[in-house]
Amino acid sequence: LYAKTTLQFRKTYKIPVKAISIPTNPEAIARGKQWVESQCTHCHGLDLSGELFLDDPALATMYAPNLTPGEGGTGAKFTDLDWVRALRHGIHPDGRSLVIMPSVEYTHFSDADLGDIIAYLKSLPGINKAQPKAIFRPVGRILVAAGAFGPIIQAEAIDHAAERPTTILAGVSLEYG
């Protein structure tokens, strides 16, 4: 069981990642901030420097990573393609699946929306805060192997070849609302 879950966590994926345009204008960064504040701060914290989000002596101890460019953060290490790979495909730059990160929820984002999110993440000030690695305990590993937590190996839950939606122009319309 330990070996099975360890193999799940260490399995690597080679997914072709399509480059997208990352804007730098203040309006795009502001839109990205809105997305990030509504989607990411629950686990990564209000300042996005990461925080403890699960601490159960039977299951696991898990920290969401620091997304800023500070020491211990991903922001200084991730390229634009790394951000796309992580957010849209649930895959770390080294090819391993992200664990728990709900990337499957971002597969419906347009390239423009994802670009805005990445633009905002790249604009963050650095916060020096390294987070410990996740620890899955025996009961947690049993539940992971049984699928009790759903698709925590995000790379296996995502249709990586799916068409991405087009951007809906803001304005009064049936599509926009």
Please place each PLM-identified region on the residue numbering.
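The canonical Cys-X-X-Cys-His
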Residues: 32, 37-46, 83, 117, ...
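N-terminal type II signal-anchor transmembrane helix
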Residues: 1-11
